[in-house]
Amino acid sequence: MARSTGKDAQALFHSLRSAYAATPTTLKIIDLYVGFAVFTALIQVVYMAIVGSFPFNSFLSGVLSCVGTAVLAVCLRIQVNKDNKEFKDLPPERAFADFVLCNLVLHLVIMNFLG
Amino acid sequence: MVNDGTFYFDEKLVNMREQQGPLATTSSVVRGLTAFSSVITESLNLTGDKILGIAKFFLGIGIPGDTKNFFDQVDSLACLENNRVSIPLILSLPSTVISLTKKDSLKVKVNTVLGSHAPPLTVTLVRAFSSSARDNSIIENQELKFDPQDAVYFLDDLPASFDVGEYIFVFKMLVQDSEQQTVYATGTLTQVPIYVTGLIKIENAKIAVLDSDLGSVETQKKLDLAGESTVSVSANHLQKLRLSFQMSTPLGNAFKPHQAFLRLRHETKVEHTFVVGSSGKKFEITLDFLGLVEKFFYLSGRYDIQLTVGDAVMENSLLRDIGYVELDLPEPPENASRPPPQPVDPYTRYGPKAEITHIFRAPEKRPPQELSLAFLVLTILPLFGFIIGLLRLGVNLKNFPTSAVPATFAVIFHLGIAAVLLLYVLFWLKLDLFTTLKTLCFLGVFLMVVGHRTLSHLASASAKLKSA
């Protein structure tokens, strides 16, 4: 039984990889961006775990900037994805403009909270 | 006429504006009297007592406050000094204290009002009696001898029965030349209070601690009140403290001083004072601590003992710390009264206080700088990973518009975003929110315009591509 689950997991993984290769490049860029943001957040959490959370507001602002920008990127991905029926009429440039604007606002707040 | 032998005139309150006091009134009477008597040939019928009374009034008021009164006083005395009615003679004593130890003699001076010499007189001490026993006169009719060098009348030795105390001496003066007796006013009798002082013998002084129930002596120590030595005793609240001594005059009589106090002072400066009672020559005070426990506020510890014995006629009055007593009192109950607060030295109360140094909050433990820098580098790494990933994906920059106008807009768009991010960095470093928001407004509006242009251009380009 374990061997079959192991084999199933591998098969699942392979199919996932092949399916992913079919996604358009733009979406891959956005995915990469999300990964980068999350990874940065993780590194900050590890740092805080090591040295303690003395300027807690700084830690929060750092992590939240990463998480916020990841969330905005995910929203962008949803809006830009052509397979998504809901946002068919929304031009991708408009979505990108929203993404940029929201990021700027987010980063203003983050900079204020950074201290 | 007043009881102390002075005599003066006062004015009836007729006119408020022109009111003069008794001094001015009497002096104007004297001036008139002496001026009148100097011009008439007959003598005025005036008793010497009245003139003497007026003279004593002027001499008895001290030095008046204002110049007019002072002038009146001196002028009247000058009139009286040499007037034709009768010249008053004043008897005075240079010292009213006679010390038995120094063997002082009684000295008496007789002068006119302004201090000039009197004619030869016979001064007699009529009576001398103790102020406490007025009927019993010790000296009677003793004539005083005259010392021409100092111009004093003196009495050489006082009789042996003169003990210390307060006395009243009564003198009488008589002008030796009988013809001149009407010229001078000597008065009848003059009373003078005299103090006779001497060394009082204090002996047999002892301090003892007694057992309260039986009255038996537990410790007894001799005191040397004349010297400097101190004693120390200890007692608890079940015992009594007894201090006793004997006092006698130089002649051996019993002596009751004006002040005989015993004071106990605690380390905390709380004091208690007691009067030493006497019977004849024996002075004794017993402090029963059982009854005094509450009065002493239940304070145990070391009490300094101070004895005070004094009187005006005692030449060896003493105020001395004679030692201390270690007192052991029980614990105070709940509702015992607290001792009264002792006066605080005003310099310590209003003086500078201890300096307060502010203790700052200990700063938080910061990580070592190398660790922080390492993690900074680690955090930047994902960015590079992102860029590398982008390149690997083969991101195309082909869609970047090449024609002039849209290109500029695209470039300006990217520059605009970079400018906003730079503004944020400046905001973190040194700007405040208000300037940042103001600048952001301008930049934001600018960016929106440019962005709209660029993106709409891109959108139209992709739409053209789609439709084509």
Swiss-Prot record, chain A:
Record-annotated membrane-spanning stretches: 32-52, 56-76, 95-115
Keyword Ion transport: no
Side of membrane Lumenal, spans: 53-55
Regions of this protein lying in the Cytoplasmic compartment: 1-31, 77-94
Endpoints of the signal sequence: none
Listed pathway(s): Protein modification; protein glycosylation
One Gene Ontology cellular component: oligosaccharyltransferase complex
Pfam families per record: DAD
Compartments in which it is found: Endoplasmic reticulum membrane
Keyword Nucleotide-binding: no
One GO-annotated biological process of the protein: protein N-linked glycosylation
Membrane topology note: Multi-pass membrane protein
Record's subunit section: Component of the oligosaccharyltransferase (OST) complex.
Protein's job: Subunit of the oligosaccharyl transferase (OST) complex that catalyzes the initial transfer of a defined glycan (Glc(3)Man(9)GlcNAc(2) in eukaryotes) from the lipid carrier dolichol-pyrophosphate to an asparagine residue within an Asn-X-Ser/Thr consensus motif in nascent polypeptide chains, the first step in protein N-glycosylation. N-glycosylation occurs cotranslationally and the complex associates with the Sec61 complex at the channel-forming translocon complex that mediates protein translocation across the endoplasmic reticulum (ER). All subunits are required for a maximal enzyme activity.
Protein name: Dolichyl-diphosphooligosaccharide--protein glycosyltransferase subunit DAD1
